[in-house]
Amino acid sequence: GDTYLYENPWTLPLGFILPDIVETGWKRDLSSPADVQNDLSDVLGVPECLIFTDGEEQGNRFSFTAPEDGEYYISVANRQIDSVKLDVGGESRSIDTLKRGYLVETGYVKAGTLILLESNDSAGSMDASAYRFDEAGLRALYERLNQHPFELETLGEEAMKGTIDA
C-alpha cells in the first residue's frame, strides 16, 4: 500500500523552560480538555488553539454546522457517556470509551457540513461543545514554549547532557 510521511514543524524539544505563571495560573482541572488547552494559551498570552463553535444540544444529541473549512473537535463534559455515534456529512462511525475525557475528532470538514453526535447511553445531557482547530494558535503556542529550549549535547543509555539558556 501507499505510505505517507508527514513532517510536524512544531515538535518541542526534550525540555524547555516555562514561565512561573504556568505553575500558578494554568487551570489544569477544567471539565473540558479544550478549555484546559485554551487556558494554557491564555496564560502564555498567545491566541487559543481551539476556537469555540456554536452548536445545539437536544437530549442525547449535539449538532453543529461547520461555519468554515477546518478540523473540528467535540468535547463531551458528561463523563457518564461512554459510547456515541458521530455523523459527519452523512458518514457515520461509533466511538467508545469516551468516559476517558478525550476530544472527539471529526476530521477535516468543509464549511456547511452538518456534524451530529448522538449518545448511545441513557446518561442524560451530553453537555457538549464544538471547537475548530486553529493552526496559527498552535504555531504561536509552540513559539512561546520553544523560547528557551533544552539543547541536547550528548545522549547515552543512562544519561543525557545539554544546556538551556534562560
Where do the language-model regions lie?
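Flexible, solvent-exposed extracytoplasmic
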Residues: G1-A166
